[in-house]
Amino acid sequence: MTERDPIPTRHATRWLLQCRPGFGADLAAELAAWSSDAGVAGWPRVENDQGRVDFHSADGRPLPTPPALTFARQAWPVVADCPQLPERDRVGALLEALAPHLPEALAGVWLEHPDTNDGKALGRFCRKFRPHLERALRERGVALERAGAPRLHLWFADSRQVVAGLAPAGSGRPWPMGIPRLRLPRAAPSRSALKLEEAVGWLLTPVEREAALRPGMSAVDLGAAPGGWTWVLRQAGLHVTAVDNGPLAESLRADRAVRHLREDGFRYRPPHRVDWLVCDMVEQPHRVARLVRHWLVSGWCGRALFNLKLPMRRRWQCVAECRALVTGGSGELGWRSAQLYHDREEITVLAWRPAAGSRG
């Protein structure tokens, strides 16, 4: 890398990718599938208990930027590795390692760590460490909070072991560690509302949200009870048909724009086309995938936002199989997927008919 290179992705031979702890092997399998399809010579190293995968160039050549991967919360090119910072002057040693790579300005400084119980203690350390680091950066002439500048990532495996990277402006999820800070409104019927709120904020672009979630639009919520997803759609002004044999929250039962049908979500057929199908049913993922495809190819909905509950093993293979089921394997239907922070043993998927106008 040339001195003070602001675009490290051109030279990166290693990427650090973050995921939900316990899903590192699944992210590695997804990386292997991408690298094989793209002809990229690389190999992953998994830190499964930390929720981290390092992807290394196999031949020393720069790696291309990975696409938006389902299991990756965050991804950035590595510029420096500090395996043992000194106890007394961690800031000085870190800046010395970063010196050849620091640009004149940074959009932000993100101190990250494993999303685990042990990582919580590191989080407290990072909050104390951050102001000292930012002050030292300013003293070296690096402007902070500059829009459009690269973002500095520092991954702390512990208080002295750090991996540093620079991410281009606008890349990755717009939150440290890929974790949005969402609060559950008191009026929400269940915590599942946070899942849909995060999905809408990440899987749709701002332009798509404005165009596709307008007051007066229509949606069907399969497996709606107690109504967390229906509630989020109502906050956007959509009219919702909530399909579930279980009860809805009282506030939704009193809402004239919500129609509750006590029916089986797999048997329900809409009387007319709706703008959205949403589904968070606890069911076999392949069965849900076939149901969503049927809705889309039948023209019953323009877009679908749904969860797939994953098996304990071979989860990436399950995702790939479900994608092929939904899209037909030929790009006939659009697909965008992510394991969100509020997902657990599941992923969230946005699928659409091309005429619905989502980006590919």
UniProtKB/Swiss-Prot annotation:
Chemical reaction(s) catalysed: cytidine(2498) in 23S rRNA + S-adenosyl-L-methionine = 2'-O-methylcytidine(2498) in 23S rRNA + S-adenosyl-L-homocysteine + H(+)
Annotated coiled-coil segments of the chain: none
Highest taxon in the source lineage: Bacteria
InterPro entries xrefs: RlmM_FDX, RlmM_THUMP-like, RNA_MeTrfase_FtsJ_dom, rRNA_MeTrfase_M, SAM-dependent_MTases_sf
Compartments where found: Cytoplasm
Molecular-function GO terms, alphabetical: S-adenosylmethionine-dependent methyltransferase activity
Pfam families documented for this protein: FtsJ (PF01728), RlmM_FDX (PF18125), RLMM_N (PF21239)
Quaternary structure annotation from Swiss-Prot or TrEMBL: Monomer.
Family according to the record: Belongs to the class I-like SAM-binding methyltransferase superfamily. RNA methyltransferase RlmE family. RlmM subfamily.
Protein's job: Catalyzes the 2'-O-methylation at nucleotide C2498 in 23S rRNA.
Protein name, UniProt field: Ribosomal RNA large subunit methyltransferase M
Record lineage: Bacteria, Pseudomonadati, Pseudomonadota, Gammaproteobacteria, Chromatiales
Gene coding for it: rlmM
